Amino acid sequence: MKKANAWSLALFPFIGLWLGAAPAWGAAAPALSEVRVFKVESARCTESIPDRVTTTQMCTHRGPTQVSVMEVGLGNNSVGRFNGAVLNARRTAVCQVGNISQACNGAGQLMGYIYVFDLNVEGPGGFEYSNSSINPPRNTLKTQLNIL
C-alpha cells in the first residue's frame, strides 16, 4: 500500500474550508413552477399585471419600457422576446428567508429570479418569456403579454 505524503494530507484542511463556504450541494434545486409578467413600466404609467391577464390595460406604453418577469423555481434557458426579437435582461436572484421572499444577500434558500427586460415600444406588440426547468420534469413554461 502506498503511503500518503505530507503535501496531499495538507490539502484536507483547505478543501474542508472551501466546502464549508459552498452552498449545500445535496439540496435539490426547486423545479420551475411559474413564470409570469408582473409589471410593465414606461414614461406614461407603471402597470401591475394581475395573474392570468394577457393585455396591458392602464395606458398605451410607448418609448423606453421595462417588463418585469417573476420566475419561481430554477431554469436554464430563459428567453425574452418582443415582436419576435430576442431581448437582454437584468436578473436578480430571489431567496426565501423564513416567510419572506427577498433579493438574495447570502441568507435563505434560492427560490427563483426576477428578470427585467428593456425594450423600445413603438406600437402595440407581443412580449413572450419562456424558460425550461433545470430538473425533472424539465418542463418549459411560457408567459405572453400584449403590450398596447
Description of each model-found segment:
Residues 81-85, 103-104, 114, 126-132:
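Cysteine-centric segments in proteins
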Residues 61-75:
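Aromatic/hydrophobic beta-strand junction motif of beta-rich domains
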Residues 10-20:
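Bacterial N-terminal signal peptides
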Residues 99-117:
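Aromatic sugar-binding surface patches on proteins
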Residues 117-147:
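Short, exposed beta-strand-loop hairpins at the edges of beta-sheets
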